[in-house]
């Protein structure tokens, strides 16, 4: 799982710890509507870095919550696996589509294209991206205390 924190304004206090996309105006409602269409299994070729060594780009997003948190917009994303740059491209592309007031059909077209160089795909800055959890479904950990 990942958390992405996006600032609406860049300040000296948040500039190193939050993402900021200048010249982007977006609405929380629009982001949430677009995000609903990414839940489930999809081919995320368009929303990840092009890598010919990765044969399968299908990932299952089980959670994509977007909400106001303090003076930030917070994205909570959980999936069965993540591709390189996938979270940052999801965030950047959702913000870009919201900025241009484009709807879910445009997002579905981006996914269908399977083109990481698609013109509407934007990569959000690395600042603001946080790993929040790792789960291995079939892993049984030995709970024996360390000496």
Predicted regions and their residues:
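Structured-RNA-binding interfaces characteristic of tRNA pseudouridine synthases
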Residues: 1-147
């Amino acid at each position: 799982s990942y958390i992405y924190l996006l600032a609406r304004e860049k300040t000296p206090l948040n500039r190193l710890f939050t993402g900021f996309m200048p010249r982007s105006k977006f609405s929380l409602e629009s982001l949430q509507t677009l995000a609903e269409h990414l839940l489930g299994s999809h081919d995320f070729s368009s929303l990840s870095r092009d890598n010919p060594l990765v044969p399968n780009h299908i990932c299952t997003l089980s959670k994509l919550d977007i909400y106001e948190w303090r003076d930030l917009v917070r994205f909570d994303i959980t999936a069965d696996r993540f591709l390189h740059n996938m979270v940052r491209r999801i965030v950047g592309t959702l913000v870009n589509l919201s900025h241009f007031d484009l709807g879910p059909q445009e997002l579905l077209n981006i996914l269908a294209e399977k083109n990481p160089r698609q013109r509407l795909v934007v990569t959000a800055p690395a600042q603001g991206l946080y790993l929040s959890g790792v789960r291995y479904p079939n892993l049984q950990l030995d709970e024996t205390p360390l000496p």
